[in-house]
Each structure stands twice: as structure tokens, then as C-alpha cells.
Amino acid sequence: MPAAAAAAAPPNPNVLQLAPRLRGLVSFPSSYSSSSPFSNRLRLRLPRAASMSAEARVPVAPPAHPTYDLKAVINLALSEDAGDRGDVSCLATIPSDVKAEATFIAKEDGVVAGISLADMIFKQVDPSLKVEWFESDGNYVHKGLQFGRVYGCARNIIVAERVVLNFMQRMSGIATMTKAMADAAHPACILETRKTAPGLRLVDKWAVLIGGGKNHRIGLFDMVMIKDNHISVAGGITNAMKFVDRFLAKEKLALPVEVETRTLQEVKDLLEYAAENNTSLTRIMLDNMVVPLGNGDIDVSMLKDAVELINGRFETEASGNVTIDTVKKIGETGVTYISSGALTHSVKALDISLKIDTELALQVGRRTNRA
């Protein structure tokens, strides 16, 4: 390619670029001698990917969204940490040319998630950092397992550390609970809801996919979902469905349509409307048809009756009173999907740490007369 053409080539949108304001807040040290103890340890401690024994997995891509910018989310997370001065603790204690190696350690059992996002964050902070993973997103890790390492400028590793861990711990917590619920609910599929952390919608939903769940609607734009308030304002479930069909036909939109039902009578009314009209209805939500009992068990008889009434004509979704203890019994009713807001609104982060190699740090201290 001629030089002029190469210069005119647009930037790759998939390559993360460090925001100009952030660039001055991280360190980019000059190259170091290949004979240094750090380069030797790099060769010893970071095996080539071909020699790793991690379970191979096809990477799980984040959900698609027309306006959500994952790069901007990463930049925001870094900016709120860096402020207008950068990491003053690192600036005070660590020379800019010091290299270090840090290890990711699982502090408890669970499903790891956020590895792909961590790669993006490290690249955003310092493209020269070398990152190696011994596990993949979606793999099960045990307490004490070292599942990844990062090597390079010590300051920049520490700048990235908390942002990487905040995302990874949250995503791993979501993925761990999703995996447990998905396994218990089979053959029904587990869905999350829109009850996600503000600004982290795609990150939370990405973690659900990594954990083996499926995504409900991403936002208000990709599915028509008629809930109790819509039904109340529209004057009933039949009127609401009629208005939806008219709207989609007028706007020439082909979108999935879900309607929330709370009683068997509402299910019957909806089925009667669907039998008499050319409708866009695709899924019926069966809300709070799982009834808690005083002994800790649940009564799913109403849910079973609703599933039998629908008889496969539409997808079904159970919602309400869904927990890790109840999801198996709910899944046995024959519903297509089970949705749980708790997957993302009540997540317990998985404990993960990133530790700099102590022996390496002591060598740095001796070399800089700081030990």
C-alpha cells in the first residue's frame, strides 16, 4: 500500500484508543535490556498459549446495541479513578521505568467472566502490557487458582488494576449465579431483566451470556413488552394487544411482542384475541404465578395450568419468586423461559485479586535503593 494511502486509512474501530486526557496520566517507560531479571522472569513465568491447558472456549461476544459505546464506558471508569492528577500513590512510590508482573488469583470458587473486557482495559491504559490468560471466560475456577498474568510498566498495571477487578468481579458474580440457575432450570432457559446497574447494561448482560443464560430485551427499543401499567392505561389486556398490532402494522416494524399476564383469565383473554386476529404476539409472561408456601416450598399449579392453556402456541416466560431454590421446580412446568432480576440487581461479586510478584518487587527495590 502506498504511504499516502496508508496515512489516509481510517482507524480500526475495534482498537481501543486512550483518551488524550488520560494519556498524560499513565506511564510509558523506555525499553529495557533483554538481560534484565525482569525479561528473564517474563520468559520463565509466561508460557506460550500453545502450552497452556485451559479449557478452550469460543469467546462470547457482548450483546449488540445501536448506541451503547463500550469504549466510552471503559474510558469513564478510568477517568473517574484518574481524576485530573492520575495515580498520585504510584507517582510517589514507583519509578516510571519499573517493570512488574502481576498474577490474577481466584479467592473463591466460581465462573470467571470479564477476561475479554480486561484485555480491552489493559490495552486502553497501555498497549505495551503483556497479558496471558490460563482460563477463558465461562470457565470454572477454584479458590487459589492463578488464572492469568500481566507484565509491563508497574504504574500502568496498578492504574488498570481496580477498574479491571471491578468489572471482572461483578461479571464473574453474575456469571456464577447464572450458571447455577441455568443448570437447575434446564430445559427452560434463564433470562436476566433490565434491572442492571445504570450505565453497565451491556456489561451485565454480557456476563449472563458468559454464564450460560440468554438475554431478555436489551432496552426499550428492541422488543414490545406490555406490562401491567400499559394494560391499565390501555383499558385491558385485549385493548393493549390490539393497539400494539395496529402500531406495528402502521410503522411497518417487525419486533417480538411479549404481554404480561397475572391471572389465568388474562391468559384466556389473550389467547382468545390471538385466535380471532392476525397478531404479532410472540411470548406470554406468566407473572407471579409461582406462589410461595409457608414451609419454604412453592406452588406451581397455576403456572402449570397456564402453560397447558397456551399449549405451545406462544413462548412462555415465568417471572416472580424465582430463586436458586425454586428455579428447578419452575423449570419442570414446561415454561420456555424463566426471568430473574436478581441475576443483575442483587449480584454478589466473585472475590478475585491481582498481586504483583513479591520477589520481583524486592529486586526492583534493591535496584532503586528503595528496599
Swiss-Prot record:
Molecular function in Gene Ontology = nicotinate-nucleotide diphosphorylase (carboxylating) activity
Is Glycosyltransferase one of the keywords UniProt gives this record? yes
Localization of this protein: Plastid, Chloroplast
Q: Which UniProt keywords apply?
A: Chloroplast, Glycosyltransferase, Plastid, Pyridine nucleotide biosynthesis, Transferase, Transit peptide
Question: Could you tell me which SUPFAM superfamilies the record lists for this protein?
Answer: Nicotinate/Quinolinate PRTase C-terminal domain-like, Nicotinate/Quinolinate PRTase N-terminal domain-like
Residue stretch of the organelle transit peptide: 1-48
> Its function?
Involved in the catabolism of quinolinic acid (QA).
Q: What family does the database annotate?
A: Belongs to the NadC/ModD family.
Supply the name of the protein: Nicotinate-nucleotide pyrophosphorylase [carboxylating], chloroplastic
Organism (species):
Oryza sativa subsp. japonica
